[in-house]
């Protein structure tokens, strides 16, 4: 990667004095649940090939309690205010054409089928290129030559299209049954898709011809990339007939595009077994990079997702990150944006390096490694969360999104150098709101568990707090993800209500190396609980905390740990379990991701459930005395609502105070960060009401 001689970072801001900051803090107000509706979301940044502008999506809540997304463009130097390029309300996946003169994007109207639209980069009316049948489009992009567009598309089954639903309503007919022939027929946040699968299509813009070029992936979970000359596509896909139980059977396919639909499909031979995702063709066309691992496990799990490069001529593959302990899927969780679960992988335009996002010790950082091997270099500072966009054609600029505990996500452009990259912040959508609010910065601590293991945690104490406060321990979901240094509305809200908030990354979390993550493989409620106990012990020793008013809460796996904690420790004043797991045996059979026997857990739910049952909180609920608020979505396909029903029944049977809040089937497992806006606010009021009842 060549070194740049000069940069054009944004002008430094004057640092306020302590007295000025204190006065500003006193003039600000506490954050409220309703402020969640005022946050502006940004995503999917795309650097213009000429490096002058950056595309992104902007997401807001409208007056009708719905999310609107539109495509915006900003100058890369941040000197002019960003401007809307499309009108929405459901526009996204915006992509520059190779000469940056036009932008293609996907328009998803509420009742219409998805359409491919094109608008001039300088603005104006968007024109339709193609209307697809009713369905879902993802992974959209121009060919490098600009003659074609490729995209993944999954059709909606005919009986579930808007037209079919309206016909039934008009004629008083019932909805049809769902007839299922495979275990893969639903996904949380995506809903029920039955036998329909994503397929890869290529649109020849000049001829107006549309071809399906790949339909071999058993689950439809493939990812792809263009060859640098636009003549072919590389696809990471699993065509094993039992792909759900064999994620390691992923292969790399190449589709060579011929004239008038004459395409040739081949497979790259000699690759090791293992999951593969986000294949990326090198700029010279001689190598393919991807994120994955070797072995039978899938992408999500206790092992590190690593970076591989395959050389076509030498017919050999290198794992570039083998000597590191980084994971390319260490997502940082938040309620104010989408976690970066998918690997983010980019070639530097001259082919000398590969860039990726690495989650480490609570930060999400942009890093790189030489493409022929070497040391990892970090290019963004710790203490924030970065999500990577794309490079300009010359490689001197890289788009990204940055958030921090005191700053919701905004679009930035990095000026590329070998060390820490200077940044231009090009959006300020949330600045006016932030200027009103009294926000709290987390303070880092490292604790030692009783077995000597080090645990990173953070504390947030309300401003001007005096005396002993009630405190809340938040436990993250996953479990193979991390809490960290990003904007978290819920944490700030609890602080504003007078609670000291603690959060940590116990064993099982990502961001601390594979040994830390794998410590609880098939053994939840063991070393993770040891680490949580270390945090609890520190809270109970803290001089500013009332040890008799400590609560615990968490969602998903965090709900699991909340359930486990109250079954093994009677020192909590109250608890909140959200979209929880309580019974691992039943969860193995009713989640959208069924458990593979004798993989993550020893045995299986239907042959030898002993390990799962031993680790199930519900097996220990005869000991629970702690008042609990239970929150769950009836449309949760990840952790079925029956998990919370079991908790509720157990508590009611024993006379333990409880309140069960069930959100309708239109909501999913991700309701706290992506659910209907009014229900997200309702959830926050329920949380505050429960803590106010038991902790004040």
Task: Explain the meaning of each model-derived region.
Residues 241, 326, 429-548, 555-556, ...:
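Cap/lid segment of the alpha/beta-hydrolase catalytic domain
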Residues 75-78, 120-124, 204-208, 256-260, ...:
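Short loop/turn segments that connect beta-strands within beta-propeller blades
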Residues 34-69, 195:
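Beta-strand-rich domains and repeat architectures in extracellular enzymes and scaffolds
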Residues 39-54, 88-106, 126, 132-149, ...:
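Conserved beta-propeller blade repeats
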Residues 4-21, 68-69, 154-201, 246-253, ...:
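Predominantly five- to eight-bladed beta-propeller fold
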Residues 503-696:
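Active-site-proximal cap/loop segments of hydrolase catalytic domains
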Residues 64-68, 109-114, 191-196, 243-250, ...:
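Short, solvent-exposed loop/turn segments at conserved positions within beta-propeller repeat blades
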Residues 44-46, 57, 150-152, 173, ...:
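Non-catalytic accessory segments flanking enzyme active sites
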């Amino acid at each position: 990667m060549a070194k740049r001689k000069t940069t054009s970072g944004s002008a430094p801001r004057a640092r306020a004095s302590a007295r000025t900051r204190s006065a500003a803090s006193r003039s600000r107000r506490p954050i409220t649940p309703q402020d969640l509706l005022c946050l502006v979301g940004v995503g999917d940044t795309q650097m213009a090939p000429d490096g002058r502008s950056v595309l992104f999506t902007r997401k807001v809540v409208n007056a009708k309690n719905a999310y609107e997304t539109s495509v915006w463009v900003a100058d890369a130097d941040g000197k002019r205010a960003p401007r809307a390029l499309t009108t929405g309300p459901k526009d996204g996946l915006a992509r520059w054409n190779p000469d940056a003169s036009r932008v293609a994007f996907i328009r998803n109207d509420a009742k219409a089928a998805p359409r491919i639209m094109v608008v001039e980069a300088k603005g104006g009316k968007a024109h339709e290129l193609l209307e697809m049948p009713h369905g879902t489009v993802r992974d959209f992009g121009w060919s490098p030559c600009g003659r074609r567009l490729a995209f993944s598309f999954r059709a909606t089954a005919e009986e579930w299209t808007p037209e079919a639903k309206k016909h039934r309503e008009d004629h008083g007919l019932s909805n049809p049954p769902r007839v299922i022939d495979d275990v893969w027929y639903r996904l949380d946040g995506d809903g029920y898709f039955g036998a329909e699968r994503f397929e890869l299509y290529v649109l020849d813009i000049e001829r107006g011809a549309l071809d399906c070029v790949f339909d071999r992936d058993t689950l439809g979970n493939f990812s792809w990339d263009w060859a640098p000359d636009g003549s072919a596509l590389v696809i990471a896909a699993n065509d094993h007939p039992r792909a759900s139980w064999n994620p390691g059977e992923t292969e790399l396919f190449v589709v060579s595009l011929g004239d008038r639909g004459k395409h040739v499909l081949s497979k790259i031979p000699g690759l090791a077994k293992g999951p593969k995702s986000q294949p990326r063709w090198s700029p010279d066309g001689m190598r393919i990079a991807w994120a994955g691992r070797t072995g039978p496990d899938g992408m999500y799990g206790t092992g590190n997702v690593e970076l591989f490069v395959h050389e076509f001529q030498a017919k050999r593959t290198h794992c570039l990150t083998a000597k590191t302990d980084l994971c390319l899927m260490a997502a940082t969780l938040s309620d104010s944006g989408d976690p970066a679960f998918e690997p983010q992988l980019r070639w530097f335009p001259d082919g000398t390096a590969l860039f990726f996002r690495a989650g480490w010790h609570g930060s999400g950082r942009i890093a790189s490694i030489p493409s022929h091997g070497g040391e990892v270099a970090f290019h963004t500072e710790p203490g924030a969360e970065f999500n990577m966009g794309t490079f300009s054609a010359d490689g001197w600029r890289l788009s990204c999104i940055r958030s921090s505990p005191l700053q919701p996500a905004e679009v930035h452009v990095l000026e590329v150098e070998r060390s820490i990259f200077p940044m231009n912040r090009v959006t300020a959508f949330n600045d006016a709101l932030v200027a009103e609010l009294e926000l709290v910065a987390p303070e880092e601590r490292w604790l030692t568990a009783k077995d000597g293991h080090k645990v990173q945690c953070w504390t947030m104490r309300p401003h001007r707090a005096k005396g002993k406060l009630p405190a809340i321990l938040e436990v993250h979901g996953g479990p193979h993800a991390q809490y960290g240094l990003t904007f978290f509305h819920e944490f700030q809200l609890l602080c504003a209500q007078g609670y000291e908030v603690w959060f940590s990354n116990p064993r099982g979390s990502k961001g601390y190396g594979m040994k830390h993550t794998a410590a609880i493989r098939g053994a939840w409620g063991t070393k993770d609980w040891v680490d949580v106990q270390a945090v609890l012990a520190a809270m109970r020793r803290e001089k500013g905390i009332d040890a008799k008013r400590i609560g615990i809460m968490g969602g998903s796996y965090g709900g699991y740990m909340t359930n486990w904690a109250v079954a093994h420790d009677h020192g909590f004043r109250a608890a909140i379990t959200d979209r929880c797991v309580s019974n691992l045996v039943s969860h193995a059979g009713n989640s959208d991701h069924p458990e593979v026997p004798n993989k993550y857990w020893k045995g299986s739910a239907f042959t030898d459930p002993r390990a799962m049952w031993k680790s199930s909180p519900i097996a220990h609920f005869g000991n629970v005395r702690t008042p609990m608020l239970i929150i769950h979505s009836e449309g949760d396909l990840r952790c079925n609502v029956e998990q919370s029903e079991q908790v509720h029944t157990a508590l009611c049977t024993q006379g333990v105070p409880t309140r069960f809040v069930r959100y309708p089937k239109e909501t999913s497992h991700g309701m706290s960060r992506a659910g209907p806006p009014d229900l997200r606010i309702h959830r926050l009021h329920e949380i505050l009401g429960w803590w106010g009842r038991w902790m004040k």
